[in-house]
């Protein structure tokens, strides 16, 4: 998946 704003 896309790791855009993963904290």
UniProtKB/Swiss-Prot annotation:
Q: Which GO terms describe its cellular component?
A: extracellular region
Q: Does the keyword Iron-sulfur apply?
A: no
Signal peptide, first to last residue: none
Tell me where in this chain the PTM Phenylalanine amide is found: 7
* GO BP of this protein: neuropeptide signaling pathway
Q: Where in the cell is it found?
A: Secreted
Keywords from the named record: Amidation, Neuropeptide, Secreted
Q: What is its main location?
A: secreted
Q: In which tissues is it expressed?
A: In larvae, expressed in the CNS and thoracic perisymapthetic organs (tPSO) but not in the ring gland or abdominal perisymapthetic organs (aPSO) (at protein level). In adults, expressed in brain and thoracic-abdominal ganglion but not in corpora cardiaca and corpora allata (at protein level).
| Chain's role | FMRFamides and FMRFamide-like peptides are neuropeptides.
Family assignment from sequence similarity: Belongs to the FARP (FMRFamide related peptide) family.
- Name this protein carries in UniProt: FMRFamide-like neuropeptide PDNFMRF-amide
Q: Which organism is it from?
A: Delia radicum (Cabbage root fly)
């Amino acid at each position: 998946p896309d790791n855009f704003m993963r904290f």
